[in-house]
Amino acid sequence: MGREPDRIGYFSFTKKATQEAIDRACTKFKVPRKDLKWFRTLHSLAYQWLGCTYTDMIQKQDYKDFYNQHGIDISKSIKTDDVPFGEEDSGLSLIDLYRVKNTSLEEEFRNHGHIKGGLQRLQRIDKLYRLFKNQRGVKDYTDLITEFNKVAQSPRLDIVIVDEVQDLKPNEWEMVRIMMKQATATYLAGDDDQAIYSWSGADVSKLIDLDCHLQVLNQSYRIPKTIFAKSNNLVSRIKKRINKEWQPRKEEGKIRNTNFESIDLNEGQWLILGRTNYYIDEVSKELKNKGFFYEKNNRLSISNDIATAYRSWIALQNNEEISYSHVKIMYQFMSVGNGGVSRGKKGLPGADMESQYSYETLSKEWGLNTPLNYSWEVALIRITESDRNYIKHILRSGHELDEKPNIKLSTIHGAKGGESQNVILFSDISKRINDNMWANRDDERRVFYVGMTRAKENLYIVPSTSPYEFEEILR
């Protein structure tokens, strides 16, 4: 690598991104994972550097206790994982927002507009929350960054790499600058056109104003010509941005403005994007009514266990063997007794967890009494009627419960970093987003730019049937 692995730091926002970076580094440079001790999220770095333990961190039970004491559910408004708190909440997120932006609760309240209970309610909740943490001796994620910055020291790293810097909040920029002071070289990777988390405190202006050597990756391996032209036209309207020269793939690609009902989803890979979960939920209902099998926000339209039980029974009928874990899941949905699984056998006591199991083995040794010619809905009698009807609807419609559905639904924010052969992008926005958009339209330009650029071949833009839509993508 040219440097000792423990003198290199790679920092990103999600555990998934850091794990992927570790995998790539281990493969390319032939180093053991344990040597890459500073490949972490920023919060994990602060946690490690401050010497924190599990008991130092606020837990779900603490939030439940806070609710029981004060009747206030603050858990969805404070950062507790790799993803930010929800965009459309009751205003309680301002209690976290002012801390990550290094501002004040009063300032964020003025910028936000009306909130039920007003500023006094927010101040009271903020005080109660701080007192609660102090009494229990616990920290939340934002406290980790705050305390790291107060110490103003970091691991002595020769090389610092920070990914997705367009999403850094002011307190995280402060943290990065502390590391930069001690580093020989710093590499910041990001795209200001994809800065879509301003509502959670991210400050893209710090990237745009950065005085540094700029290197643009000038070739896209995803975006075809037509989608390149339309998406570039959209972001060119952003008032303050870094101008970039880059090239699309040589393929043309296609863009259509059309209604959702006219699109044939049976063939190819599809990613359906909405600005908020409300629109995704509406599409989800329609797809379920039509018998499509799909994935919404990384979850199957039917539970993983039900899908696994169904596939397992079909596999046994096809004379295939199934794994120990799949047998256990399948047994959950079978009755106990003569027509199902013998009493005491559902948990597979004493079975080898590494083995594969045929129908013959299960029926002779592991209590499976269900005849092999029984249909899946008879064999898996404990699947609820509504789920059975949905599976039958999927099968009647000519679809299958494949391992990976060909249709995925997501908010635009949830799909960042993803891609698909075909993308359907709804132009709908909520009234709240519409009202806020006039103060900073550039934020929505960036969001819909991210949505458009998920498409590898075809982009279908669906006009809104409501008064509220981001009409710029229809031009």
Question: What kind of feature is each model-predicted range?
Answer:
Residues 13-16, 155, 159, 166-251, ...:
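Conserved helicase motor core of SF1/SF2 NTP-dependent helicases
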Residues 254-268:
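Conserved interdomain hinge at the start of the Helicase C-terminal
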Residues 1-55, 232, 453:
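P-loop NTPase Walker
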Residues 34, 181-185, 455-457:
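A short helix->loop->beta-strand "cap" motif at the edges of active sites that frequently abuts
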Residues 7, 75-161, 170-175, 188, ...:
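Accessory N-terminal region flanking or inserted into the helicase ATPase core
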Residues 13, 33-50, 292-318:
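Conserved beta-strand -> loop -> alpha-helix junction used to position metal-binding or nucleic-acid-contacting
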Residues 38-41, 139-144, 148, 405-413:
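Conserved two-lobed SF2 helicase motor
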Residues 316-462:
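Conserved helicase C-terminal RecA-like lobe
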